[in-house]
Each structure stands twice: as structure tokens, then as C-alpha cells.
From Swiss-Prot:
It catalyses: dTDP-alpha-D-glucose = dTDP-4-dehydro-6-deoxy-alpha-D-glucose + H2O. It is linked to Catel-Manzke syndrome: A syndrome characterized by Pierre Robin sequence and a unique form of bilateral hyperphalangy causing a clinodactyly of the index finger. Pierre Robin sequence includes an opening in the roof of the mouth (a cleft palate), a large tongue (macroglossia), and a small lower jaw (micrognathia). The keyword Lyase applies. Signal peptide: none annotated. The keyword rRNA-binding does not apply. Belongs to the NAD(P)-dependent epimerase/dehydratase family. dTDP-glucose dehydratase subfamily. The gene is TGDS. It is an enzyme of class 4 (lyase). This is dTDP-D-glucose 4,6-dehydratase. Its EC number is 4.2.1.46. Pfam families: GDP_Man_Dehyd. It comes from Homo sapiens.
């Protein structure tokens, strides 16, 4: 697919220029992607395929749910008959595959489910997409496939050394996707992004969990020492990265989507306490922190190079202070967008 077809403001008269399938579109990052596509590309039909798991919410899409170029289909990527029929009936041109089980803590107690959804489901989807001869297949992976590192920065050629069931399932799914390029020259592109934060994220992940705990006058639960660091990227920045890959990404390639902004979990908790509880006192901040048992494995860092996507013209734009303030405000008003969301605030999955 050329960049030109994404630059044209209008499609063919009486129809849509392209039909784009986004999997997991009621989830966190994919919902931001769908809103952007629906609003900015009115000549593209955006089809949201989601089975509506516990971490999904159609409220993430309320602003565009009645748009003429948006369609929601409830279904499971692991249902091969359904997926094949979907490609046949919807005449899909482009796939952005976000749908996955993503919570690392949960992957330790539901490893087989992660393998089934993330690996088998991806294989079902890429196979159906190949059979339907779609123009481009974007597989959304994670920096965690590299494993942790204290000093060495990972680039796209670094070996995959995942250390938890979630990362292992994403790495395995990458292998299936990449094999369709190697064997058939099917136009796949793989992305690996840093930790993304912002509105719409189910509060099992560290930033929305800490925000929600503090807003409910509960302590931040820190796994282990809390000295592990993560690179945080705002949701709208990662959407721009995916758009860049759609426009300019080369088939068969992998693109890291990272940021130099890095923060330890302890420092994250302190910053959120300062912003939400309005205190700079170290002793008062300690009163809002609860250290709990660590994960079975918990990588210290995921340092990652992103020069390759920089070469396509993308760089993150949203400063941390701006992004985190927007995120805090959103959770103040939208915490109950999910059913039984309170269970997400426990230190470990329940």
C-alpha cells in the first residue's frame, strides 16, 4: 500500500476507498486508533472486531459509534470459521491486529489462555488475511519480547528472549506472522512498543492502577523493590506511530516504537501521589505506598532503540507532565467504564 492512498482526502464516489479491520478495538490502544481513523479518514470504513473481554469497553468509542464509516462486530479471533467468513463478507483491505491478552501478572496464572488467544488467535487471523489477499497486515507486539537488560539497548535485530508467559506468547505470535512474509511475501509489518499510558486503559496496568487506587484513598501496591524502570509513551503518540507505519512501513520489517522517557515504579508512585494527594513530604508519600511480593519474574528495564521509525518521520510529542495530567483527569470521571472494575485494583489478579 502506498502512502498516497492514505493522503487522499476522499475515496471513490459512492463507496469507501479502503476497508480496515482493527482487532481488539474496544480495548485501550486500539480504541484510540479507531477514533483517529474514523475521524481523520472518512473515506475509510473502519471495522472493529472485539469479543468484549473483561478489559474492553464500548464506552471508549462513544464519540464515533454513530459515524457512517464505523462498524462494530462482536466476535473471537480464535474462531477460524467466523474469521474466514468475516474476511469474505467485509472485503478487508488492511488489518491492524491489537487483540490480545496483555496483563503480565495474569499471564502467570493463565498461561495456556494467553497462548491460545495470542498465538493461536494470531495464526487464525494472519492465515485468513493471507487467504483474502489483504494489502497490509500490522501485528502489534511489545518491547517485552526482548527480555530485560540493564545496559544494552535493543534494536529490531536483537534476539527475542522473553521472560514471562505474556511476552513469550507475543514472541511466538511474531514468528507465525513473520513466516507469512518469509514463505509467501505476504505484506506483514510488526511493531514493538514501549509501555503506553493514557485514557481508556483498564486499571490492572500500573499507571491507571496507581491513579485509581489513590483516587479511592488506597495505597499504591508496588511489586518487589519498585526499582524496575519502564519507558512510558502517551496513547496519541503511539497512534501516530501506527499511522506512520501504515503509510511508510515496509513489508517484512519490524519497527520499535519507543521513548527516552524512563521512570522507576517507585518514582512513578511518588509523582502520582504528589499530583493526586498534593503533598511533597517524603514521609507522607510513604504512607501511600504498600510494598507487596514481586512477580515470579520482573525485568528491570526494556531499553530500546527507535531510530528505524524515526527515519520514517515519527517521534513522540506529548510531554510526560501533559500526558499524565490528562490521564489522571480522565480516570476521575471514567473509572466505572468497566464492569466489576474494582477487582483490577488488587495487588495480583483475583
Amino acid at each position: 500500500m502506498s502512502a498516497a492512498c492514505w493522503e487522499e482526502p476522499w475515496g471513490l464516489p459512492g463507496g469507501f476507498a479502503k476497508r480496515v479491520l482493527v482487532t481488539g478495538g474496544a480495548g485501550f490502544i486500539a480504541s484510540h486508533m479507531i477514533v483517529s481513523l474514523v475521524e481523520d479518514y472518512p473515506n475509510y470504513m473502519i471495522i472493529n472486531l472485539d469479543k468484549l473481554d473483561y478489559c474492553a469497553s464500548l464506552k471508549n468509542l462513544e464519540t464515533i459509534s454513530n459515524k457512517q464509516n464505523y462498524k462494530f462486530i462482536q466476535g473471537d479471533i480464535c474462531d477460524s470459521h467466523f474469521v474466514k467468513l468475516l474476511f469474505e463478507t467485509e472485503k478487508i483491505d488492511i488489518v491492524l491486529h491489537f487483540a490480545a491478552q496483555t496483563h503480565v501478572d495474569l499471564s502467570f496464572v493463565r498461561a495456556f489462555e494467553f497462548t491460545y488467544v495470542n498465538v493461536y488467535g494470531t495464526h487464525v487471523l494472519v492465515s485468513a488475511a493471507h487467504e483474502a489477499r489483504v494489502e497490509k497486515f500490522i501485528y502489534v507486539s511489545t518491547d517485552e519480547v526482548y527480555g530485560g537488560s540493564l545496559d544494552k539497548e535493543f534494536d529490531e535485530s536483537s534476539p527475542k528472549q522473553p521472560t514471562n508467559p505474556y511476552a513469550s506468547s507475543k514472541a511466538a505470535a511474531e514468528c507465525f506472522v513473520q513466516s507469512y512474509w518469509e514463505q509467501y511475501k505476504f505484506p506483514v509489518v510488526i511493531t514493538r512498543s514501549s509501555n503506553v499510558y493514557g485514557p481508556h486503559q483498564y486499571p490492572e496496568k500500573v499507571i491507571p492502577k496507581f491513579i485509581s487506587l489513590l483516587q479511592h484513598n488506597r495505597k499504591c501496591c508496588i511489586h518487589g523493590s519498585g526499582l524496575q524502570t519502564r519507558n512510558f509513551l502517551y496513547a496519541t503518540d503511539v497512534v501516530e506511530a501506527f499511522l506512520t507505519v501504515l503509510k511508510k512501513g515496509k513489508p517484512g520489517e519490524i519497527y520499535n516504537i519507543g521513548t527516552n522517557f524512563e521512570m522507576s515504579v517507585v518514582q512513578l508512585a511518588k509523582e502520582l501521589i504528589q499530583l493526586i494527594k498534593e503533598t511533597n513530604s517524603e514521609s507522607e508519600m510513604e504512607n501511600w505506598v504498600d510494598y507487596v511480593n514481586d512477580r515470579p519474574t520482573n525485568d528491570m528495564r526494556y531499553p530500546m532503540k527507535s531510530e528505524k521509525i524515526h527515519g520514517l518521520g515519527w517521534r513522540p510529542k506529548v510531554p510526560w507532565k501533559e500526558g499524565i495530567k490528562k490521564t489522571i483527569e480522565w480516570y476521575r470521571e471514567n473509572f466505572h467504564n468497566w464492569k466489576n472494575v474494582e477487582k483490577a485494583l488488587e495487588p495480583f489478579p483475583v
